Amino acid sequence: RTEYLFLSHCHKDHSGAFSRLVSRGFRGWLVAAGATVELARIRYNKVIQADPLSAWPMGLGRDLHFSCGRSGHCVGGLWFHIWDSGKSCFYSGDYQPGPLAFAVDQVKGRRADLAIVDCAHPDTQEDARALRSRILEWIGPCIADGRRVVLPLPRYGRGLELIALIKENFPQAEIAADQGFTAAVEQVCGYGEWLRAGREEQIRAFLEEQPEKRLERDVYDILLLGDTHLEQERCRSLAERELARGGLVIITGRVKPGGFVQTLLDGKKAVRAHFPHHQSMGDFMALLEQNNFQTVVPFHNGRRELYFQAAGTGSKRGLG
């Protein structure tokens, strides 16, 4: 009976269930950015392409409307504001207000009865700049000592952010990457409207350095692997090789329970750093202050909480 399904972006933890929904009978409209549909390789004949650059809300019938904006998380990443004549809902998707590489349309001055808001890092108040500085504190001393840094990453997402971060702070560092990662980076260069000004040129310059050739020649300071959980045998082998040489593996995202990355962390063979590709608790609270959301559900963490706002004040209620 679902008429509309709003998909925020292409990452598997969001798009991966779509085919299952279809197999279970979903025949409604999929609302998503065209880039999301393409990168997630969705084949479906009822798609409404959401345009974050449109100056006008889009009507869906029966007095239902929505507007959207770029979420700063990845190519195709969106937030949605949905309303009808009675109620309204805001959904942040995976949101980051201060990205380096991705364009973001700031969420300010919006009102919603219900808001579902990214709060993936609830244990820190630090903003994106502060969290990025933590990662630099790992990378800098390591490469200064002649040791290599390995960063397992998703193919679409924070890899571009890390390229920008490394280029800005360690311009002389040689970056290598596996072929899967470089192919994905080349693919997203075709979506310039999702990148901040100047970043497409920076990323193309990175590709012209032929990072996969540096990997073949074994000449590099930092290795980017397009395999978040190190599930591919070649990526696991490369990580283990650099660990044996005294290198450092930095985990910047979600850890799959029982996986190889979890084993590395448990054995203190890797370190974990919060990368600001989602919101911290500080970001989350700032977003609430900048908008009028009556009931707020934080997501992307294991907590069960609701936040309520009334007359400029806020309160929190745990759900057990």
Go through the PLM ranges and name each one.
Residues 8, 33, 118, 178, ...:
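Conserved residues at the C-terminal ends of beta-strands
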